[in-house]
Amino acid sequence: MCIRDSLLASKVTSTKELKNSVKVKYEHKGKEIDVEFDKLIVAVGRKPNSEKVLPKNLGIKIENGFIQVNEYCQTSVENIWAVGDVVRGPMLAHKGSEEGIMVAERIANKQAEVNYDLVPNVIYSHPEIAWVGKNENELKSSGIKYKVGKFPFAASGRALAVDQSVGFVKVISDEKTDSILGVHVFGPAAAEIVQQALISMEFGSSAEDIALTMFSHPTVSEAFHEAALSVNNQAIHIGNKK
């Protein structure tokens, strides 16, 4: 999938199949727009079917198809556990794998947990989109004051060299403590950059910690470094806010 135009707060109202294309009518910002596309992909989401596969006499609580579990993936029946897409949270393979490891450890009477605040999300489009932690809307809703640093791949030497200069890295940190609250990447190697951010956040790094870390040159990872520098108006290869 190649992203050319991304529209939010939009609604498809009708589609019509033509001879060699598909006509799509949608609403955006109060306007009705008609566009023709070569192909139309419809993503309708997924939902669990736990109610159909679990015997009712087990006594396991289910809500909206999801098996109800505690923070350690234990169901309402003491010796039955559930992980992955059938329980709450994002339907991601790595999230389910970590839950499986946690459950195995706890069954063996060992301490283990999953940090659900730091689950990496990746959209494998072209360019890639990836994020971890909070976004600005979530922080505003929670009343948390924050700072933002942003760096475009158009200013990255490596991104320009490989002709993948579309996109940016955004770092959000706490206004007082400077702790990184969220990292969002749109562009080349987004999934890999977010993984670096996740490790940093797992160990409580601040934007300044990343800013003081040496990054290899030329790499697309430097965009993460520059975005962290930008949080405190110290970016090197772009202008800073006054």
Question: Where are the regions a protein language model picked out?
Answer:
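Short, acidic, Ser/Thr-enriched surface-loop or helix-capping motifs
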Residues: 27-29, 70-71, 174-175
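Short, small-residue-biased leader/transition segments that mark boundaries at the very start
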Residues: 1-3
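FAD-site-proximal beta/loop scaffold in flavoenzymes
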Residues: 34-107, 192
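Flexible, glycine-rich terminal cap/loop adjacent to redox cofactors
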Residues: 125-135, 140-242
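General small-molecule cofactor/ligand-binding pocket signal
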Residues: 7, 35, 147-149
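A conserved short coil-to-beta-strand element within the FAD-binding core of flavoproteins
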Residues: 8-21
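Internal hydrophobic alpha-helix adjacent to the cofactor/substrate pocket in enzyme cavities
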Residues: 94-117, 145, 203-205
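Short loop/turn motifs at secondary-structure junctions and domain boundaries
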Residues: 18, 52, 58-60, 161-167
